[in-house]
Structure formats: structure tokens, C-alpha cells
Curated annotation (Swiss-Prot):
One of its GO terms (molecular function) is rRNA binding. Keywords: Ribonucleoprotein, Ribosomal protein, RNA-binding, rRNA-binding, tRNA-binding. Belongs to the universal ribosomal protein uS7 family. This is Small ribosomal subunit protein uS7. It comes from Streptococcus thermophilus (strain ATCC BAA-250 / LMG 18311). HAMAP family: Ribosomal_uS7_B (MF_00480_B). GO terms for biological process: translation. The lineage of its organism: Bacteria, Bacillati, Bacillota, Bacilli, Lactobacillales. GO terms for cellular component: small ribosomal subunit. Pfam families: Ribosomal_S7 (PF00177). The keyword Ribosomal protein applies. Signal peptide: none annotated.
Length: 156
């Protein structure tokens, strides 16, 4: 690991179809072994399925789903006087998106549908309806933060 300053964040380009940076980040998150074309096909096909199933704009459904998945609070381990405390802290905006996308893709991969595009589409639709594994992950994270509220004064 470099001892110099932190590596600068690179700007993500908006995807050509929806002109959205968050869709590009979703494609990057779905991508395996550098196969961006395959990942883009999966995401765009999933968005087509969402549009057919709901009749609404797929990007709006996806943004609703992301709002339902992104956490507001999380716990971080903090060592105080020889013992570790799970201290609840607010999640920075950039990290909220990162966690939301990570949980969405992981929940999609864990589903039982036949293809990844089906799994991703169903998970996004579930998340838009406030159900599904990704939303449950957020609820669990919030519950953990609420349970450890007593240690909030250890915040840094």
C-alpha cells in the first residue's frame, strides 16, 4: 500500500443509453473478469424486463429501488479502553450508493432465477416494492445501528 497521499477518485462516465452515472456504476458492479459488454447486456436486458413487467420507466424503478436499498446508518468498530464497540455512524453519500449497488448485485446473484438478467430485474422490482434480500440487508444494518445507539457518543 502506498504511503503517499490517497489515490484520486476517477470520474465515472454516464452510460450511453440512459445517460446516467449510477447505471454505469451498476454495470461496473455486475461485470466479471473485465467483460463490460456482457455486463452491459445483462443490465440493459434487465431494464427491458422491468419496463415490460411494470409499464414504468426502468430508470425510475431502479432509482426508487436504490432509494429503498441505500443505508443511512451503519456500525463501525471502534476500540476504546481494550474493548471493541460497534459505533453507529452516518453513511457518506458516495458510500451509500456503493453499498446499495453492492447489496443489490449480491442479492441478485444469490437468487434462484435462471439467468442473471432475470435475477437482477426481479431484485430491482422487489427493492422498488420495499421487499427482497437487498432491502432486508439495509433493514438489518439499520437495526444493528439502532441496537448500538448507546455507543453513539464514541463517534469520531
Amino acid at each position: 500500500m502506498s504511503r503517499k497521499n490517497r489515490a484520486p477518485k476517477r470520474e465515472v462516465l454516464a452510460d450511453p443509453l440512459y445517460n446516467s452515472k449510477i447505471v454505469t456504476r451498476l454495470i461496473n458492479r455486475v461485470m466479471l473478469d473485465g467483460k463490460r459488454g456482457t455486463a452491459a447486456t445483462i443490465v440493459y436486458d434487465a431494464f427491458e424486463q422491468i419496463k415490460e413487467a411494470t409499464g414504468n420507466d426502468a430508470l425510475e424503478v431502479f432509482e426508487t429501488a436504490m432509494d429503498n436499498i441505500m443505508p443511512v446508518l451503519e456500525v463501525r468498530a471502534r476500540r476504546v479502553g481494550g474493548s471493541n464497540y460497534q459505533v453507529p455512524v452516518e453513511v457518506r453519500p458516495e458510500r451509500r450508493i456503493t453499498l446499495g449497488l453492492r447489496w443489490l448485485v449480491n442479492a441478485s446473484r444469490a437468487r434462484g432465477e435462471h439467468t442473471m438478467k432475470e435475477r437482477l430485474a426481479k431484485e430491482i422490482m422487489d427493492a422498488a416494492n420495499n421487499t427482497g434480500a437487498a432491502v432486508k440487508k439495509r433493514e438489518d444494518t439499520h437495526k444493528m445501528a439502532e441496537a448500538n445507539r448507546a455507543f453513539a457518543h464514541f463517534r469520531w
